[in-house]
Amino acid sequence: MSFKYFVTNDINIPQYTLTCLLYSIVMIQFKKLINAKALYQEPDRIWVAKGMTFFAVDYSGKRISCVFNVGGMKDRLLGCHRLSSQLLRVGLHHLLPLKNGNILVTAKRRTYLYDKDGNVLNVWTGYQGNKPGHQGVCVTPEGTIFFAEYLLNPNRDHDIHLWRSIDNGMTFNVVKTWEEGDIRHLHFVKWDKYEHCLWLGTGDYGDNGSENRLYRSADSGETWELVGQYSQDWRAIGICFTEDALLWGTDAGSCSDTVHFVRMDRKTRKIEIIQDFEGPCHGCASFAGGRAFFSTGVEGGENEKDRYSRMKEYHDGRCENVWKLEKDCWPLIV
């Protein structure tokens, strides 16, 4: 179990999901809106998924769009129950409104492109893995889409690819490849509105933590600067942005290293460990004004303090717990 967060590229307002429940947050007060999974938030609506369908609701939870159906009957049946959907990774995982008005959604091993009327324009299956990490897909202000491959790859015997689309999701091409044995997988790719660049993270282990890296690209993915590497402190599942720093929690849930909350100064590129977390950081989201939220999960790792998943708010240089829930009875699912 973990809290997961999603944030738009432009307005920096997070959504919060706990299993299949959607909540809104105002001054750290929670209100249940609808039984659904939050995928993307806009100023006047929240895009949510229920099984293999998605639609938009307003801030009272009322549906304000048509219902989009994804995939075949088998997936729709498996996606109706939480246990089967989690075990088999059935369901919808990402949603991106595109610059031309179309909508990109990811499901298990398939990425769909819809127009506003619910017509399927394209189905892409050329990538490895079931799905990207929860911050593994992004779109830039110019409309370029990036898609980061995430697969288990325990033997490091696969090349790993970063994909890019410059035609609103109709075609994708490899823009960068890590050769087999170099890394395990890609964790995230995110647009930074402050530096007008992309950041990308990899994991998980390697000699002296060599697979844990942070990259930066200022030319739409053509070239990538290696900013940091080595140790579990560079192992991030996602990052948050402030005007003067990058923030992340480490994803060191299945190893002995302490899970840290890390700040990287934009000017010096030096990282500072701010505090310890109780479990691996699985999600994060940025607010306007420098506020950010982070979540921890339960994986059964030796460095976890307890069986609680937590939501934390970052302000005044530190993270404080604002909500926690105990791990449920279901098996651990990474």
Feature annotation, model-predicted:
Residues 245-259, 274-332:
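Loop/turn-rich, solvent-exposed surfaces of beta-rich toroidal or solenoidal domains
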Residues 64-71, 121-126, 173-177, 225-231, ...:
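Beta-propeller fold detector
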Residues 118-140, 148, 174-178:
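Asp-box/WD-like beta-propeller blade repeats and closely related beta-sheet repeat scaffolds
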Residues 56-58, 165-166, 217-218, 312-316:
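Conserved Ser/Thr-centered positions that define the repeating blades of beta-propeller domains
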Residues 43-44, 100-101, 142-143, 195-196, ...:
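Short coil/turn segments that connect the beta-strands within blades of beta-propeller domains
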Residues 105-106, 153-159, 204-211, 253-258, ...:
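Short, solvent-exposed loop/turn segments at conserved positions within beta-propeller repeat blades
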Residues 32-41, 76-80, 85-98, 129-138, ...:
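Repeated scaffold domains used in trafficking and secretory/extracellular systems
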Residues 50-51, 106-108, 147-151, 201-204, ...:
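Recurrent small/Gly-Pro-centered beta-turn motifs in extracellular repeat architectures
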